[in-house]
C-alpha cells in the first residue's frame, strides 16, 4: 500500500511543525518497510529536513493554474462545471500520477478539499476554535474560522 503523508507545516510554525516531525519519527521507528510511505511537501526546506531523516519525498509546486483552479473550486457553480467536464485539480492529478492509495493529512488543510477520487484521513486536533479562540493563530486577522469549518465539514463528508 502506497501512503502519501501531506506535510504542510514549516519550521517557523513551531508546535505544529514539531508535532508533524514527531509523526515522521514514529513512522520511521515503527514502519520497518511494511508500508510504502512518501511525504508530500510544498517547501524545499522541509524536503531537505525529511530527506535528512531518510524519508522519501515528492515536491508539489503550486503553479498559477493550480491557484486559479483553487479559486474556481470555491464557487459552487464553477466547481460543478469542473466536475461535469471531469477537470481534475492539479493537486489531485499530481497525487494520482504518484499512484497513492491513500493520503494522510496531519492537520486540517484546504488541500483536502481538492480530493475527489483519492481516499484520505485527516487529524483534527481540536474543535473549540469557535468558542475558545485562545490560540494566537485564531486571533490573527488573516485566519478564517469559516475556512476552517469548511475544511472540517469537507473532511467529515469525504474521509
Regions found by a protein language model. Name each.
Residues 1-159:
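Carbohydrate transferase catalytic cores enriched for Leloir-type hexosyltransferases
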